[in-house]
């Protein structure tokens, strides 16, 4: 049978962006093991590679129209799973303050569950510019804690993580304020 004009096929779930997302999930335990074993250079390398796949899968999905329902759900789960794992591992094996992890995890899980609920009700909540800044700050902060750096870098690493926490909270509040405006 031929294609019906005006009808577009949904992309298959078996596509490059979804494979990259799945690989990110599969490699989280490898990252955690390396960090818990204090193989900081290797853990840093795996973390950076996994974060790059996050950027890459999104770019490929948008460029080639390979956005799928699986990707909409699995990608944010993979992102949060990696970041939460990294934060918890740094609490256990390094000197990242626990309060930072608690604040970030509560916000990430809360907003992610809310976005999933909105998606389930056919409302896509796109990532905000502030959310992208938050992700960059969290990524850089975690990378600084993972990277074997001289002790004089402890203060700059801490400052980046404090900024990440502040932006995490502010963007979380902003999502809720924006949602309230939409619902009113």
List each model region and its residues.
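Alpha-helical transmembrane bundles and membrane-interface segments of multipass inner-membrane proteins
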Residues: 1-184
């Amino acid at each position: 049978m031929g294609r019906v004009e005006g009808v577009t096929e949904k992309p298959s779930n078996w596509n490059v962006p979804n494979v990259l997302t799945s690989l990110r999930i599969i490699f989280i335990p490898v990252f955690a093991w390396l960090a818990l074993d204090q193989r900081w250079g290797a853990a840093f390398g795996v973390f950076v590679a996994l974060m790059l796949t996050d950027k890459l899968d999104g770019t490929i999905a948008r460029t080639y129209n390979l956005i799928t329902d699986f990707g909409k759900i699995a990608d944010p789960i993979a992102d949060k799973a990696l970041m939460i794992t990294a934060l918890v591992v740094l609490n256990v094996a390094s000197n990242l303050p626990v309060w930072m992890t608690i604040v970030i995890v509560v916000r990430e899980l809360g907003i992610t569950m809310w976005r999933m609920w909105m998606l389930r009700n056919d409302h896509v909540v796109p990532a905000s510019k502030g959310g992208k800044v938050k992700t960059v700050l969290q990524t850089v902060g975690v990378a600084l804690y993972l990277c074997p750096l001289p002790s004089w870098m402890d203060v700059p690493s801490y400052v980046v993580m404090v900024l990440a926490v502040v932006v995490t909270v502010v963007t979380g509040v902003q999502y809720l304020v924006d949602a309230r405006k939409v619902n009113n």
